Amino acid sequence: MREVVIASAARTAVGSFGGAFKSVSAVELGVTAAKEAIKRANITPDMIDESLLGGVLTAGLGQNIARQIALGAGIPVEKPAMTINIVCGSGLRSVSMASQLIALGDADIMLVGGAENMSMSPYLVPSARYGARMGDAAFVDSMIKDGLSDIFNNYHMGITAENIAEQWNITREEQDELALASQNKAEKAQAEGKFDEEIVPVVIKGRKGDTVVDKDEYIKPGTTMEKLAKLRPAFKKDGTVTAGNASGINDGAAMLVVMAKEKAEELGIEPLATIVSYGTAGVDPKIMGYGPVPATKKALEAANMTIEDIDLVEANEAFAAQSVAVIRDLNIDMNKVNVNGGAIAIGHPIGCSGARILTTLLYEMKRRDAKTGLATLCIGGGMGTTLIVKR
């Protein structure tokens, strides 16, 4: 089978809930990132054979947001596009699925990634279809229902983090320490301009002129253990998971161009990385945050590698509790993981996050001249997905 490379990667800044992107749809964010990824790959939109793009909260956005983004980016109508929803893993799974198609010869060049605007997720009125026959009619938050609730146990994702904290004996202090490290690293990285190269500015038109958003909005400078310790448990009365040691509710898009290695050579393109292996696995939905462990073991086995062979790791910080469990059980060197902060600081726009962490990983690998990298996320519903790349 053919080798597959990543030719380019670009992302928007990550916006806060109700922040800069509150009126910029996931499609618009996706188009901006897609155009930039295509430009950075030094190809034209008509060279894209197919688009596979992640998106989770798509209610009210119209049919197949991947198709909307593809056409918005100038890709011809003859080229197909498909939206992928494997919740938080969508943006990364799109990459591994595209690599399968390319390896088999079904495509040469593909657009992959993900886009999400959690701020714009609508409320649903299920009883409105046939009429609320008697009593009050409830509004259902589609963001919670379709993105942040465990359908199998009927509770919030935060409870799955509490379950892990209890089962793995992870203390509140350990969680806050990881959260603090994430914030401090992200604050430092942003101040040093480390995210600038990967971010494409989003121009928002307004009555008083244009606003340019080119900085991650959610990072909280000046975070301390004292401030984190004051926060109350968010999901359980005597729990340990707080707003401070959990990821944010965010908006953003990240896109990449992947292609056959032989096509890159033909076009004279120097890729960011080569895709080595990938793995997706399931766990009990009650401990969904543990999903990266079996997924990573699967990817490492496929690559005939050990975790010690990996130079840099981006492990999505859905919650500090699950991050501690994953890092501990995979025996990941803390000096290699989320070196510029993670989702607790930067944010977690769910359908975009897989592509966001991969984009961040690729640029940091380039900066450090790292040879191997691994990106992994836990997935609501009890799964994990991992991708390994090399330079």
From Swiss-Prot:
Gene3D superfamilies from the UniProt entry: 3.40.47.10
Catalyses which reaction(s): 2 acetyl-CoA = acetoacetyl-CoA + CoA
Chief localisation class: cytoplasm
Positions annotated as active site in the UniProt record: 88 (acyl-thioester intermediate), 348 (proton acceptor), 378 (proton acceptor)
Source domain of life: Bacteria
UniProt keyword terms in alphabetical order: Acyltransferase, Cytoplasm, Transferase
InterPro entries: Thiolase, Thiolase-like, Thiolase_acyl_enz_int_AS, Thiolase_C, Thiolase_CS, Thiolase_N
Enzyme Commission number: 2.3.1.9
PROSITE patterns from the UniProt entry: THIOLASE_1 (PS00098), THIOLASE_2 (PS00737)
CDD domains: thiolase
GO molecular function term, any single one: acetyl-CoA C-acetyltransferase activity
Cross-referenced PANTHER family: ACETYL-COA ACETYLTRANSFERASE, CYTOSOLIC (PTHR18919:SF107), ACETYL-COA C-ACYLTRANSFERASE (PTHR18919)
Subunit structure, as described in the record: Homotetramer.
Function: Catalyzes the condensation of two molecules of acetyl-CoA to produce acetoacetyl-CoA.
Family, per entry: Belongs to the thiolase-like superfamily. Thiolase family.
Protein name listed in UniProt: Acetyl-CoA acetyltransferase
UniProt organism field: Clostridioides difficile (strain 630) (Peptoclostridium difficile)
